């Protein structure tokens, strides 16, 4: 980037836009196109792999023959590695360049995914998942950096739209894809799927991303100690939060140890930063109104995704439905993605404020949750088709608008003027993305469990011995199962179990209604945060116009 942006605080938005238009290529060529395709595939691949792992966790545990408690660490091994490598990618990317990191990481990731289904040893499986997380975790922070520096401004809205659609679509298409693999091929394909896609990404990166300039031999090598403290601390906190519900939170010594150790390492990273600042990290650059608010909105958006990740699958799963039966309900969220992406990109290019696009998306998601709050235990996947279409449009608009605001914030805050600024910017949002997704899922699981206990207790108050309604139901059910019971006593016990299962089913249904209402109110809160965002000085249409008229201005000056 031209050095003229370095003092961006003294420049007007017009000067920043002109310098940005000068530094970014005005014409798209084969190399940037392949590079952009590669990083978009990489961003979607990370999300798809994590989602497929969570869906196929039961099959993976059965394959290894591990217990429930040991199997719970498999998902944490992959996701904690993602969290660890996110901040550390700032150091690696600044030291070696994105091309080297992505090619090496994608190659190791491909080999790891190819051999993962063939591993039968629990310890080796955990180690392989950690390697897969460490390698795939480099994809997301480096993608935004490359796209911002190489895509012509008139194509930037469509790139953002496709980028958001790939990430969002991977979440919603995973249940149907995994169900199809499981029914027609094998559960092994939840890893082999990624092993086939990653080489395509490598080809695009190899031909599309230029090599980073050689580092000066006499230049001092930045210290990695602060990055190590920060990454390890975040990974420990992430693991503690993800395992907190299973370990019973502060009543568990393991949870307490992970939480305190993670907090201590974060404190060490802060002290290290204050005593000896690292040239590759620009934490003060993040302290801006819109950057902080956009981080909060990304966290909030990840929580609203629990509607399609947790609420809808579990509301159908209580009937014993398999992944291929649940998938059709969720895949309707992914059906309109390409059309919505093209429409959103066109609107952004026509000077639509991305805040309005994001607000429209959150509004659609909130209305869809209100419609889903009419759920009953008689619902099947078909009952969700219409609301999931609305949810798909809402998620796409909200995420595209959010990423659009993030990119504009990165440009007009001067992020492109220094590599360490944009790397820090990308790593910050990568960390928020992971923490938001996990914290939202953990909180929703805890919320549903607590609400189910409450509703079970309240419903149970109306089922008492001596009540003529209860006695009548017990007698009718006992008579119905008597023919297949060993006697009157056994029939009565089975009747009592049936009434108990009915109560639990209704309690779960009521807890899901509470969950839908919670997500709807979360969308309202997101709309309030969106209203607090400051308008960007210029929009994508203005940036496009700057780049189109740049040659004429340069000729006039000459």
Region spans (language model):
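Hydrophobic transmembrane architecture of multi-pass small-molecule transporters
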Residues: 18, 412-416, 428-558
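Helix-loop-helix hairpins in multi-pass membrane proteins, especially solute transporters
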Residues: 86-226
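Transmembrane core module of solute transporters
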Residues: 30-81, 85, 276-408
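Cytosolic juxtamembrane N-terminal segment immediately preceding the first transmembrane helix
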Residues: 1-48, 62
């Amino acid at each position: 980037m031209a050095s003229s942006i370095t003092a961006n605080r003294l420049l007007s938005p017009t000067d920043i836009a002109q310098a940005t238009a000068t530094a970014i290529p005005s014409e798209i060529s084969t190399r940037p196109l392949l590079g952009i395709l590669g990083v978009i595939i990489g961003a979607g691949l990370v999300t798809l792999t994590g989602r497929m792992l969570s869906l196929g966790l039961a099959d993976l545990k059965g394959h290894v023959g591990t217990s429930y408690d040991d199997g719970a660490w498999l998902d944490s091994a992959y996701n904690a590695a993602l969290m660890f490598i996110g901040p550390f990618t700032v150091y690696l990317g600044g030291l070696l360049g994105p091309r080297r990191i992505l090619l090496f990481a994608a190659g190791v990731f491909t080999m790891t995914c190819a051999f993962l289904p063939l591993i039968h040893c629990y310890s080796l499986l955990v180690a392989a998942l950690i390697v897969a997380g460490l390698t795939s975790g480099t994809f997301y922070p480096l993608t935004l950096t490359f796209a911002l520096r190489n895509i012509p401004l008139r194509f930037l809205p469509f790139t953002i739209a496709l980028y958001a659609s790939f990430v969002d679509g991977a979440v919603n298409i995973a249940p149907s894809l995994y169900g199809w693999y499981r029914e027609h091929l094998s559960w092994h394909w939840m890893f082999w799927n990624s092993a086939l896609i990653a080489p395509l990404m490598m080809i695009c990166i190899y031909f599309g991303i230029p090599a980073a300039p050689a580092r000066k031999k006499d230049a001092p090598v930045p210290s990695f100690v602060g990055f190590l403290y920060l990454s390890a601390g975040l990974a420990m906190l992430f693991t503690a939060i993800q395992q907190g519900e299973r370990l019973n939170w502060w009543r568990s010594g393991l949870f307490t140890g992970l939480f305190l150790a993670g907090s201590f390492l974060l404190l060490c990273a802060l002290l290290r930063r204050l005593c000896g600042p690292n040239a590759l990290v620009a934490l003060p650059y993040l302290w801006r109104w819109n950057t902080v608010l956009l981080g909060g909105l990304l966290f909030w958006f990840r929580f609203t995704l629990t509607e399609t990740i947790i609420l809808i699958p579990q509301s159908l799963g209580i009937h014993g439905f398999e992944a291929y039966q649940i998938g059709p309900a969720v895949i309707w969220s992914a059906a309109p993605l390409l059309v919505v992406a093209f429409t959103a990109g066109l609107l952004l290019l026509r000077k639509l404020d991305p805040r309005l696009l994001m607000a429209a998306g959150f509004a659609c998601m909130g209305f869809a949750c209100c419609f889903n709050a009419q759920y009953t235990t008689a619902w099947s996947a078909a009952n969700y088709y219409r609301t999931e279409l609305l949810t798909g449009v809402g998620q796409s608009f909200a995420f595209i608008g959010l990423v659009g605001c993030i990119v504009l914030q990165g440009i007009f805050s001067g992020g492109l003027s220094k590599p360490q600024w944009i790397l820090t910017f990308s790593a910050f949002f990568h960390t928020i993305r992971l923490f938001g997704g996990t914290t939202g899922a953990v909180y929703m699981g805890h919320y549903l469990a607590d609400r189910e206990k409450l509703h079970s207790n309240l419903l149970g108050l109306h089922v008492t011995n001596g009540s003529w309604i209860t006695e009548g139901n017990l007698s009718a059910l006992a008579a119905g199962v008597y023919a297949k019971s060993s006697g009157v006593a056994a029939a009565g016990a089975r009747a009592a179990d049936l009434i108990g299962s009915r109560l639990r089913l209704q309690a779960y249904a009521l807890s899901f209604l509470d969950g839908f209402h919670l997500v709807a109110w979360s969308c309202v809160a997101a709309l309030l945060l969106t209203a607090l965002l400051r308008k960007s000085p210029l929009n994508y249409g203005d940036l496009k116009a700057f780049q189109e008229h740049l040659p004429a201005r340069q000729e006039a000056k000459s």
